[in-house]
Amino acid sequence: MKTPLVTREGYEKLKQELNYLWREERPEVTKKVTWAASLGDRSENADYQYNKKRLREIDRRVRYLTKCMENLKIVDYSPQQEGKVFFGAWVEIENDDGVTHRFRIVGYDEIFGRKDYISIDSPMARALLKKEVGDLAVVNTPAGEASWYVNAIEYVKP
C-alpha cells in the first residue's frame, strides 16, 4: 500500500517533471513521429517505431503523474515534529556494530533516483516513526530482527 503523502519539494519535482514531459518532450517526440510517418512505410521505419514507443511511455507517465498528484497530500514541516521522527525527517541511525546510515523519510513517489530517501511505507520508516534521539528501533528483515539506535533527527525548515 502506498501512503499518498509527499513533501513540498517532492511535489514540486513531480510538477516540474509533468510540465517538462507535457510542454517540452512530448511536442518534440510528436514532431519526430510525424516526420517519420511522412517517410512512408512504417513497418520497417525504426525512427517511427522508436518514437511512437517513446510517445506511449511519455503519455503513460503523464497519466500516472496527473492521477497521482490529484491524490497526494503535501506534508509541510511543523514545529510540533521537532525531536521525534515523522514524515519528512532526516534520520541518522546506528547499529551495535557502529554502522551508521542517514536518510530522509518521504513519500513513495519521491524515492526513485535517491539512495538517501526511504519510503514512509518501508519497514525501516515504520519502525522509526515517533522515535526520539537515543531510542531503539527494531526492524523486521528477511534475516531476522535488526536493532538501530536513533542518533539524530533533522527537518528541512521552510
Swiss-Prot record:
Gene3D superfamilies: Transcription elongation factor, GreA/GreB, C-terminal domain, Transcription elongation factor, GreA/GreB, N-terminal domain. PROSITE patterns: GREAB_1 (PS00829), GREAB_2 (PS00830). The keyword Metal-binding does not apply. This is Transcription elongation factor GreB. InterPro entries: GreA/GreB_C_sf (IPR036953), TF_GreA/GreB_CS (IPR018151), Tscrpt_elong_fac_GreA/B (IPR028624), Tscrpt_elong_fac_GreA/B_C (IPR001437), Tscrpt_elong_fac_GreA/B_fam (IPR023459), Tscrpt_elong_fac_GreA/B_N (IPR022691), Tscrpt_elong_fac_GreA/B_N_sf (IPR036805), Tscrpt_elong_fac_GreB (IPR006358). GO terms for biological process: DNA-templated transcription elongation; regulation of DNA-templated transcription elongation. One of its GO terms (molecular function) is RNA polymerase binding. The gene is greB. Belongs to the GreA/GreB family. GreB subfamily. Necessary for efficient RNA polymerase transcription elongation past template-encoded arresting sites. The arresting sites in DNA have the property of trapping a certain fraction of elongating RNA polymerases that pass through, resulting in locked ternary complexes. Cleavage of the nascent transcript by cleavage factors such as GreA or GreB allows the resumption of elongation from the new 3'terminus. GreB releases sequences of up to 9 nucleotides in length. Keywords: DNA-binding, Transcription, Transcription regulation. It comes from Escherichia coli O6:H1 (strain CFT073 / ATCC 700928 / UPEC). It comes from the Bacteria. NCBIfam families: greB, PRK01885.1.
